């Protein structure tokens, strides 16, 4: 990372000041610390990189690059309270294993962790009349932040896949956007999830040509939704902000390399 990038994305040392169990599958870690004093306000929906220690490390690793770099994972900012200097991040747990989810599951109040960022919002157009927002448990905070930034006159639909009913409370209500929920369980297959998403799209009929879309889902779901919107709805690519938050049966490091070689 060059000096300019480092200035844009400083590394900060924090500690866990509170832990909130949102659901059996979602755990909120509230981070505090003196180095959050100059963290920029109004960053809900942006993201930070959480620097996870390498296996066997017992001290905080604040190294961003090189062979001894920390494991880096992106997490959406749920809330930043500049008065209290508290940053809230939600971690999916008990659905898979990996460095970040394993660390978050075992984390305790008082533990220290480094973060870098913030990075930008995934979507930054809030002057449209019509919106489609797709999300799941990994992107629900990004979707919530977008809802709060939309004008009250915006229309459209919010389509969410979540791991528990408790997570529904995380999403703000918008007067003119209808929310559609699918609460997942082990009996709902990956194929059935995609079928449900496509069924919803077909029920919406022809979308206005200027619809703005956010898609924050599993990688295969992102590809299917994006293809449908481009080919069946003839939406311009510039109107679609699509991000694969994770990929089924693929670890985050491998998925990151795949996205660099073949963007979604």
Swiss-Prot record:
The name this protein goes by in its record: Ferric siderophore reductase
Cofactor: FAD
UniProt function note: Ferric-siderophore reductase involved in iron removal from the siderophores after their transport into the cell. Catalyzes the reduction of the ferric iron bound to the hydroxamate siderophores produced by Shewanella to ferrous iron. Can use a ferredoxin as electron donor. Despite the clear evidence for the interaction with NAD(P)H, no direct reduction of the enzyme by these compounds is observed, nor consumption of NAD(P)H, suggesting that NADH and NADPH are not the physiological electron donors.
Binding site residues for FAD: 73-74, 76, 90, 92, 96, 100-101, 247, 249-250, 252
Species name: Shewanella frigidimarina (strain NCIMB 400)
Keywords in alphabetical order: FAD, Flavoprotein, Nucleotide-binding, Oxidoreductase
EC number: 1.16.-.-
UniProt-recorded Gene Ontology molecular function terms: metal ion binding; nucleotide binding; oxidoreductase activity
Keyword flag Nucleotide-binding: yes
Presence of the UniProt keyword Nucleotide-binding in the record: yes
Family the entry assigns: Belongs to the SIP oxidoreductase family.
Residue ranges of domain FAD-binding FR-type in the record: 9-127
């Amino acid at each position: 990372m060059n000096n300019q990038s480092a200035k844009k994305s400083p590394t900060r040392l924090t500690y866990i000041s509170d832990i909130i169990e949102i659901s059996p599958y979602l755990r909120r870690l509230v981070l505090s610390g003196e180095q959050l004093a100059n963290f920029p306000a109004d960053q809900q929906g942006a993201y930070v990189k959480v620097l996870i220690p390498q296996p066997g490390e017992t001290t905080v690793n604040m190294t961003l690059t090189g062979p001894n770099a920390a494991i880096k994972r992106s997490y959406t900012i749920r809330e930043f309270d500049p008065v209290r200097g508290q940053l809230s991040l939600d971690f999916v747990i008990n659905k898979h294993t990996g460095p970040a989810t394993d660390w978050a599951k075992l984390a305790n109040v008082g533990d220290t962790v480094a973060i870098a960022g913030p990075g930008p919002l995934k979507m930054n157009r809030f002057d449209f009349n019509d919106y489609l927002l797709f999300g799941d448990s990994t992107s629900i905070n990004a979707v919530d932040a977008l809802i709060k930034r939309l004008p009250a006159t915006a229309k459209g639909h919010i389509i969410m896949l979540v791991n528990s009913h408790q997570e529904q409370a995380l999403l703000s209500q918008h007067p003119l956007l209808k929310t559609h929920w699918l609460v997942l369980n082990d009996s709902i297959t990956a194929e059935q999830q995609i079928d449900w998403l496509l069924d919803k799209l077909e029920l919406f009929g022809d979308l206005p040509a200027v619809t703005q879309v956010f898609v924050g889902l599993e990688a295969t779901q992102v590809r299917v939704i994006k293809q449908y919107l481009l080919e069946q709805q003839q939406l311009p690519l510039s109107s679609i902000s699509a991000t694969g938050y994770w990929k089924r049966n693929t670890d985050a490091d491998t998925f990151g390399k795949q996205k660099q070689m073949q963007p979604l």
